[in-house]
């Protein structure tokens, strides 16, 4: 079983934290290839999605960044 994350939403969440994909790899403990798959809209395991979301929720959003991002 697998699921897909929204590419745009994941990229936005990374930007809000000032993170790169490599930062997400380190914070989530997931392989770079799995993070790449998620960022390109390919299916990933639900357990990987859980780890991605958990890592993002633990990281603070940088104040003022949202206003700088295009919607």
Question: Which ranges hold each PLM region?
Answer:
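Generic alpha-helical scaffold signal
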Residues: 4, 43-46
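Recognition helix of helix-turn-helix/homeodomain-like DNA-binding domains
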Residues: 29-44
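Compositionally biased non-globular segments, especially hydrophobic aliphatic-rich helices
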Residues: 23-24, 41, 58
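Key DNA-contacting residues within the recognition helix of helix-turn-helix
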Residues: 25, 36, 50-53, 69
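DNA major-groove recognition helix of helix-turn-helix/homeodomain DNA-binding modules
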Residues: 46-65
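A short, Lys/Arg-rich alpha-helix, primarily the initiator
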Residues: 1-27, 66-67
């Amino acid at each position: 079983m697998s699921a897909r994350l929204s590419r745009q939403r994941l990229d936005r969440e990374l930007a809000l934290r000032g993170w790169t994909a490599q930062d997400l790899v380190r914070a989530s403990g997931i392989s770079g290839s799995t993070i790449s798959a998620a960022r390109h809209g390919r299916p990933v395991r639900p357990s990987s999605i859980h780890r991605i979301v958990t890592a993002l929720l633990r990281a603070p959003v940088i104040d003022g960044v949202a206003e700088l991002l295009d919607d």
